[in-house]
Amino acid sequence: MNSLSTEQLGIGYGDRVIVEDLNISIPKGKITTLIGPNGCGKSTILKTMSRIMRSHAGAVYLNGKAIHKMSTKDIAKDMAILPQTPEAPSGLTVHELVSYGRFPHQSGFGRLNDEDRRIIKWALEETGMAEYAERPIEALSGGQRQRVWIAMALAQGTELLLLDEPTTYLDLAHQLEILQLLDRLNKEQGRTILMVIHDLNHAARFSHYMIALKKGTVIKEGTALEVMTPDILKQVFQIDAEIVTDPRTNKPVCLTYDLIKNEKELVTV
């Protein structure tokens, strides 16, 4: 069962075509990761699937409904999006930012009710940010800020979370902190998660499903073991990679790789 899908989706900037005839389905209740080289269309696809960008052809379907026919508020009730390097208004506290997640559910003057407060408290606790509720966003570390943004997304009460490079600019410990949080949200609450990640080993470790892209085209999709193979990485990234399976996770790990400079060495998969 799929909660988010595209049908013959076409995306572009002016006369430049980025993606054409894209057909993908995001498995419900799973973590799916888009991988591919810079400029392959990963973030563009994510933005279009969340209606931040408009498509020039085809459609995106959210729970069976075409999103271009849905109101922004209705979309926000079903799907939360965390863009790359989001910026909070100056002087905002953690609690204030997380409370913005309740906006799609409010009416009238937009005042928080008891249910809103309960959900905000829960989101802060789930992300380990309750003790920082009254702290200014500017006073937080990079990893803490990302957790606050995820808390805001949780406060929306959506089943579907879209994240564009949620570990960008974070050190290794903070990267794992964020990915383990997303993994827990998926396992304990059944959240459907679609994200863009550059680190292949992180993508493989934390994903149920991977979609490898090159120049706006799907090269391979499937489990990490099916997608992260030497042949696929050679075609997508132009690298000669050594892949082993981690016995603890049964997931593929890229041990080392070299750049392929001779196009004759590339294979068509």
Swiss-Prot record:
Described purpose of this protein according to its UniProt entry: Part of the ABC transporter complex FhuBGCD involved in iron(3+)-hydroxamate import. Responsible for energy coupling to the transport system.
Chain positions recorded as ATP binding sites: 36-43, 160-171
UniProt keyword annotations, A-Z: ATP-binding, Cell membrane, Ion transport, Iron, Iron transport, Membrane, Nucleotide-binding, Translocase, Transport
UniProt enzyme class: translocase
One Gene Ontology term of the molecular function aspect: ATP binding
Any Pfam family: ABC_tran
Name of the protein in its database record: Iron(3+)-hydroxamate import ATP-binding protein FhuC
Catalytic activity: ATP + H2O + Fe(3+)-hydroxamate complex-[hydroxamate-binding protein]Side 1 = ADP + phosphate + Fe(3+)-hydroxamate complexSide 2 + [hydroxamate-binding protein]Side 1
Family assignment from sequence similarity: Belongs to the ABC transporter superfamily. Iron (Fe3+)-hydroxamate importer (TC 3.A.1.14.7) family.
